[in-house]
Structure formats: structure tokens, C-alpha cells
Amino acid sequence: MALPNCSLNVNRELVDPNFESYRLSLDSIPTYNIELDAAVAEVKLKDSQYTLDHVRAFGMFNYLQIDPWYEDSVYFVDSKGRVLNLTVTLDTALGKPREMFHFESDSSSPEALCASLSLTSATWAALSDGNGKLTLLRTSKRGESSHLKWEPMFSESLGDPFIIVHSLAHVHSNVHTVEVLLLRVQKDPSDTKGSGFSVSLEWITVDNSAGQGESEEKKYAVRKRRVMKGKSVPHYAAVEPQGKGVIVASEKPFAFTEVDGLPLEEPPVQDMEVGNSDPIYFWQQTEEDVTLCVRLPEGTTKDDIRFKLTVDCLRVRVGDYAPLLDGQLFAPVDPEASTWTMNDDKSLEVSLQKRSEGPLWSEVVLGDRRGEYLMNDEQKSQLQQRLSYLTSEDLNPNPEKDKPPCNAQELEDCDMSPEDSSTLMRFDGATLKPNNVVSLGSNQFLFSVHIDPSETPAFCLRHDVDALLWQPRPDQDNNIWEHISTFNALGYVQASKRDKKFATCAPNFSYAALCECLRRVFIYRQPSPVDTVLFNRKQGRQVGQVAKQQVANLDTNDPVLGFRATNERLFVLTLNNLFVLKVNN
């Protein structure tokens, strides 16, 4: 597993340390009910799909998709194999959902999964039939041509059944490319100690580069297939814009294993001969910088040195030989403040200025173990103090050890610490290696949401009692994870909802919403100014803002299958109904 090399930086200006609580509002929420002509195409878990990963991936699947490009427009698939759309313009004049596309689906197959739809761009969509077939659809501009049926441009069976996690489209050199991320939970005979299943994410690239002649129709075909595997269903997975990489957040780490059906193997690189003794370089550090001394072959001149340093990568080579050092740095550095010098033709001294002072590095280049770390006396003393609790002069430092605080037989799997801490990883699309790793630790994943359709979906994590919304920005080297909004105390509130199934928020951050498995919806609004004078008698101050909580009870006994939010409305999908809640005016 790759070691964490960066962290999530909270914007303190977006955090309210004085937030008290939500006030229950009795204001009614206008709710409109649309009865469906046919039931939603729900596929329940089979007896063979008994693991927690199956429940997370397919049992908690959100059957309702919202259109990020056209507000208040949602899509779902019904039991007749129809992709249906509802676009709201006037709440009091809601029509029936319209059919946009029809496909053949066999949900009775023992391996069948739920059909899944992903809106790829303003004019394209990706559809899985639940039996392993991927279809790419040209939708035209959905907001302007909502009456037009969708046109299939690509349809191909891709093996075992899957659901679509994310998709996007981009154009380069007149070639239209669609990137699709597929999720599978498959039997794994090699996993004898675990559940017997493994989780895979397949990143597929489809384009129309074939048929470049003027009179020849450009046909879409699969150009590349990359598979990454892990041991847990990811909380979050998305392809970056332009297909430059993949972002995955999961309890257990993922790694790429296959490319176009062939096992991914590291090419053997012949190291340059620099002498008989190891290591190749020595290094030491302070809180401000890292200094390393790289051994050079005899006869090396300054003109032979090829040195390249960016914010997060270092490359050192001599002439045309294989690089002595090449890879991702443990943490970002300041290239302008970093230097290198050559000492008496035998070594190269490199000084790297840390971008963030304080954290100590455990290695220079991620995965490179050919260097030796040299500690000074002060660092050795600090290390001994940190490890002093592991040694003791007392024969029995814990006299209460014969009185265990609990019965070990009463412990369950959920009481144990996980083998791997949850991580957020960004994989480079060219090297397929993680170049940005964040340890999420105790920051519980809550939900993901499309804020800007041109960007990667944002994700929400619990930080202490609050819920913080993060927007990935891969193009920003110094701040790839940007804190864009905060929902006060939502982390604490959602933990008390034992029957919670879905969570989401409005794209303009005006409210967050939770939905239980059955009937109830909770809305938590951002603090807003009050019309009257309120006075806090305990603290002796006037209250200028109040955050309201509202509860809606849906008139149905069917379980909730889908839940999406826009700036003005909440959409709740059940087996036979679609509810529209008017949240904001």
C-alpha cells in the first residue's frame, strides 16, 4: 500500500466553531406524488450475494440519476426496460415521466444486477443493462430536445455484469472519447481467508478514431481497458476530466493489475553501476528541508547530470543511462527554493525545500528503498522518547492485566480495528501509479455529489461533528483537494440516524438532506438571518442567525430506492412512486 504523502487542509473560514444546534421548523414542505406506470427495475440481492460488499454496491444502489447539466431533470429505469425522464418546470403541473430509450433486459438471470445509467456529458449517456452489456447513447441536448429518443452509438458485451460508477466525455484532435468506470464484485478462489470475493474497477476508454475518411462513418470501439482490484467496495470512484487519472476512496487500497487483458508488470530497469556498496544515496532532514547525497560513477562531469524537479517529482540521471532517482516525492516541495551541487566529481548534493514545514518524511521517493537515512543526535533522542513506552524497568507495569476490561468472546468483527486505514488515492492515467495519497483515518465518508458538471464529483467527509465538502482539483498541484463548504454538525446528526440510506446536498450548498430506508426525509438548512429579535439568555447575547431542520413523511410504504437534490427540489424514488419536494423557492 502506498504511504500517505499529503493531507486534507481545512479552510477555517468555512467552519463555525460557535454553531449551537438546528431548530426544528414546523413549516410544511410542498410534496408532489407521481404514480409510475410500471415499477422501478429493482433487482434484489441473490442468496449468493451475501457479503457486505454486495450490500454496499448493489443493495444500497441509488436508482435515481440527476442531470447536472439541466436542473430539475431526473432519470431512472423501470421494469419494462425503459429509461424514463422527469423534468420539472412547474410543480403544480407535473406530467408523467417520458420514455427516452428502450432496451432488452433480463433481470431473472442468476448473475443479473440492476441496470445503471450515467450521464456522460450534456449530449451523451452510458447505460448498463445489468447483464454485462455497455451501451453509449447520443442524447442530443437533453434540455432543448427532451422529446427526442436517444440514439445508441456503441453497444458491446464486456464480460461479467457490472454497474457504472462514473463516466465522462472529451474531445481531442477531432476524436470523441468516452471514459467509463465499471464496478464488479466477483468470486475470488484465491481469497480463502476472506469472503471469497474481490472488488474490481474497470476503466474503459471508447472513442471514434476508426474510420477517419470523409465518406466513412466514424465508429466507436473500445481502445483501452484497465482493471484495478481491491478488497472493499469504494466509497467514491471517478475519472478525472480529459481522462488524466482516476480517484478512488476506499477502506482497503486499490491497485491496477491488468491492461488490455494482460497482467500489469513492472518493466525491469537495469540500474547504473555506481560502485560495489549500498546504498545509492544518503539523506537527512529537518522540519524545513531534505538534503540527499547521491553517489555518482567515476568520471562524471557536471554536463552529464540530467536533473529535473517539479512540485512532487524528482528525476536524476547521468547521460543516457537509466535514472538514479526517478519518481513521486513523499510530499510537495518548492522547486524555486531547492538547489543541487556537485561535490568533487563523486557525489551530487540535492537540497529540497519542503512546501509544508513540520511533517517528517519516511522516504524521499515513494517506493525507493535504495537510500539510507541519517539521523542526527537530536532526532535520535526524540525517537527514543516516542518509543520509551514500549520498554519498562518494572517486572509487572500493569498489575490489572489479569482483569480484562471486557470478554473477548463478546467482540465481533465490527469491534476490531480495520487492517488498512481508509485512503483517498489519485492514480495517474499514464503510469497507473498512485501519486497522491491521503489517509482519511476517522474521517467517515458520507456522500458524493455533482457540484459542477465540468469537474470531478465532490465528496463529503465527517470532520469531528461537522460534514465538510471537498472538491478534487487535479490541475492544482498545491491544493488538489479543496474544502468548498461545511454543513454544521451534520456529521454528528447523521450518526444518530440508524435507518439512514442516502445523503446528499444542494449544488449551491443551501441545504443537506438525509433519507431513511422508509418514508422519512430530513432537511438541514444553512444558518439564515431571523426576522425577529432572538436572545440567548444563557449566554446573554442576541442571536442573528438560525439553522433550521425540517422533516417530511412520504405517503408510501415502499422502501426508498433513489434520492437526489437540486437547489430547489428533492426527488425521492420508491418502487411505484416518484416524490418531488419543493425545498426552496
Curated annotation (Swiss-Prot):
InterPro entries: CS_dom, HSP20-like_chaperone, NUDCD1
Assigned GO CC terms: cytoplasm; nucleus
A Pfam match: CS
Region spans: Disordered: 392-420
Subcellular location: Cytoplasm; Nucleus
All copies of domain CS, residue ranges: 276-365
Matching SUPFAM superfamilies: HSP20-like chaperones (SSF49764)
Keywords associated with the record: Cytoplasm, Nucleus
PANTHER family: CHRONIC MYELOGENOUS LEUKEMIA TUMOR ANTIGEN 66, NUDC DOMAIN-CONTAINING PROTEIN 1
Protein name listed in UniProt: NudC domain-containing protein 1
Gene name in the database record: nudcd1
